[in-house]
């Protein structure tokens, strides 16, 4: 059912689309938003002090809305390239279900709402970090890096890695080494995750003119870089335990998950240049999603149990 009737709204000829609530929800990139919210929640819970439960809910909702705003602004600007990629052609803007000006307005309103709510009701450091994240993703990455350099997702990955730092700052009003380590885990995870996708979607990116690594440096070079990042990510994933932030439970879980990541990356490294099935790349892409969720779930469980034991012994 349409939210509004199609109608002329001004002399410039802008039209209100017959979009559904589901179309606007899709603008938020809910799958991406769910990972952002989860990692931010882990940062919030792992912080060494407690936060009022109501403020915690406000912080997480603000981060979620901010992440969704970034997605909406990304879809507004990328409508031209989304339209020629099979993976993204059905998105609300390129498919015509939502007008570009609606996506832009929606994204801008949510951006301001999320940042102001977080700043006024929680603290301004976390709000500033959220504002920076929205700007970095929607402007620096989407409008510049994505179409300019094969290092787009390496540099742009910083936006997706900041949420646990925002969660931490929402509780403590500061940034610590522990929150930066959580940032590094996501930052180093991002290139192999997206390059695995780019390997088996290189045709899409080629048609859209996006300089992803496989299209610029070739598949062989991309496979080597994926493996190199996996070798760095694995020990960084264990770093929170080595630095004394977690118990051995997390350390063992992170070690096993990291070894799994390296093994899948090794399989990608050994792919033949003429491999059209791309099964190792698809397997790594799927495993990388599991890895990020599992390693942060282990961190969350470790933090909750450790805090419960500390309270019990008090």
Curated annotation (Swiss-Prot):
Catalyzed reactions per annotation: heme b + (2E,6E)-farnesyl diphosphate + H2O = Fe(II)-heme o + diphosphate
GO function terms (MF aspect): protoheme IX farnesyltransferase activity
A GO cellular component annotation in the UniProt record: plasma membrane
Pathway of action: Porphyrin-containing compound metabolism; heme O biosynthesis; heme O from protoheme: step 1/1
Coiled coil, from the record: none
UniProt keyword annotations, A-Z: Cell inner membrane, Cell membrane, Heme biosynthesis, Membrane, Transferase, Transmembrane, Transmembrane helix
InterPro entries: Protohaem_IX_farnesylTrfase, UbiA_prenyltransferase, UbiA_prenylTrfase_CS, UbiA_sf
Pfam family, one: UbiA
GO BP annotations, alphabetical order: heme O biosynthetic process
Record EC number: 2.5.1.141
Segments passing through the bilayer: 32-49, 54-76, 98-118, 120-140, 153-173, 180-200, 226-246, 249-269, 285-305
Membrane topology: Multi-pass membrane protein
Superkingdom as given in the UniProt entry: Bacteria
Subcellular localization(s) per the UniProt record: Cell inner membrane
Biological role stated in the UniProt entry: Converts heme B (protoheme IX) to heme O by substitution of the vinyl group on carbon 2 of heme B porphyrin ring with a hydroxyethyl farnesyl side group.
NCBIfam families (alphabetical): cyoE_ctaB, PRK04375.1-2
Miscellaneous section: Carbon 2 of the heme B porphyrin ring is defined according to the Fischer nomenclature.
Family the UniProt entry places it in: Belongs to the UbiA prenyltransferase family. Protoheme IX farnesyltransferase subfamily.
Protein name listed in UniProt: Protoheme IX farnesyltransferase 2
Organism (species): Mesorhizobium japonicum (strain LMG 29417 / CECT 9101 / MAFF 303099)
Gene that encodes it: ctaB2
